[in-house]
Amino acid sequence: MESSREEALRCIGLARKYLNAGEYDKALKFANKSLRIHATTEGEDFVKQIEKQKLTGSPNPQATPKQENKSNFFSEKQSVRENGNSSAGEKKQKWTSEQHLLVQKIIKYKNHQYYEILDLKKTCTDTEIKKSYKKLALQLHPDKNHAPSADEAFKMVSKAFQVLSDPNLRAHYDRTGMDPESRASAASSSFSSNAGGHPGFSAYPQANMSPEDLFNSFFGDQFFSGPGTFFFGGGPGIRVHQFGGRPRNFARRQQAQDMPPKSIFYQLLPLIVVILFAFLSNFSWSDSTSVNTRYSFQQNYKYTVPRTTAKHNIPYYMSQKDLDKLSSRDIRRLNEKVEHTYTQNVHNACLREQQIKEDEIRRAQGWFFPDKEALKKAKELRLPNCEELNRLGYRTYSNSYYF
């Protein structure tokens, strides 16, 4: 991949800089990193040169023609990336022919030709869909690809992934060959029936993301520095919210790889905020509900009489005075209200659990080498609220885990 070769050359440049300064350990570190990213004969020779000089303590000899060509090539690549191949007085071209051809290949398709856009067959798996999206998104991101219509191609790839990664939207598309959003009401009603009739039930919040937010959810931890990004469900008709600004400059994303790891506190801060928000919102929700409908999910001095719903045996509490005033019809309606509210709470908590598990898996996979032990633990994380949702008769799906 071109981006891997460029990163390898950047590491070679840093290694040569440290070698000239006599810092052999740092030079060796970046030279070895270059080989891991993109192995070359020149890189291997350079590592041997550094090790030899480290043992002898001799200064850096005059660069060989091969090394000079390597440095010139790196400088030229930097120049092409920043200024483009252009002569004086002409408009600067900031893209390569390969980038331009890729853009033209994508935009030649119609907006709803999702399989063709991602270069996939209709029998493709979820893993193949994710791999294709990640590859194309990196090549077409507007901060990386400046070819004409690259932004349009990037949006088409994002849209194709959003449809094909959602089993319900994909099934609708396979049946009709049309954009599922062109018949939003029909798709919504069909989805509600598949989910047990629960309004606004969806375990795929990425369907509501913008192309940039979708890209950040895949690559944010690897390409960005600064505050983290996290998501939470917001009740019926789930929406996705993003917190913490991220710079758009693509070069800064790559430089972030060399930054020291954040402290555990800053890594866990987004999760702490999500949990705190969920606790406060659920507390206020339950409190207001108990006032309006005269029941509570928690027993207290006012609500002392234990009750359970008829359908799912969900426990709640009432006061004896209020209970005596209710007719059998009122009690039946109250039971329906309790079950609906309880299901909403569990549904939102399930989405949060799925997002947390997905974040843990992505963090364990890393950028170059996965942490196998951490990845195993992340995959084994239980989702108790999702299990409860299944017990209530609702179908749930994994929130796009990266297995």
Swiss-Prot record:
Region Disordered, as annotated, extends over 55-95
Transmembrane helix among the record's keywords?
Answer: yes
Q: Topology relative to the membrane, per the entry?
A: Single-pass membrane protein
Answer yes or no on keyword Ribosomal protein: no
Keywords on record = Endoplasmic reticulum, Membrane, Phosphoprotein, Transmembrane, Transmembrane helix
Q: Which residues carry this modification: Phosphoserine?
A: 58
**In terms of domain of life, where is this protein from?**
Eukaryota
Q: Which GO terms describe its cellular component?
A: endoplasmic reticulum; endoplasmic reticulum membrane
Please name the GO terms of the biological process aspect recorded for this protein, alphabetically: cellular response to misfolded protein; chaperone cofactor-dependent protein refolding; protein folding in endoplasmic reticulum
Instruction: Specify the J domain's residue ranges.
Output: 113-177
> What is its subcellular localisation?
Endoplasmic reticulum membrane
Transmembrane intervals: 263-283
An example Pfam family from this entry, by short name, is DnaJ
Q: Where is the composition biased (Polar residues)?
A: 55-88
- State a single Gene Ontology molecular function: Hsp70 protein binding
Tell me, in one coarse class, where this protein mainly resides: endoplasmic reticulum
Q: What is this protein called?
A: Uncharacterized J domain-containing protein C17A3.05c
The record lists the organism as: Schizosaccharomyces pombe (strain 972 / ATCC 24843)
Question: Taxonomic classification, please?
Answer: Eukaryota, Fungi, Dikarya, Ascomycota, Taphrinomycotina
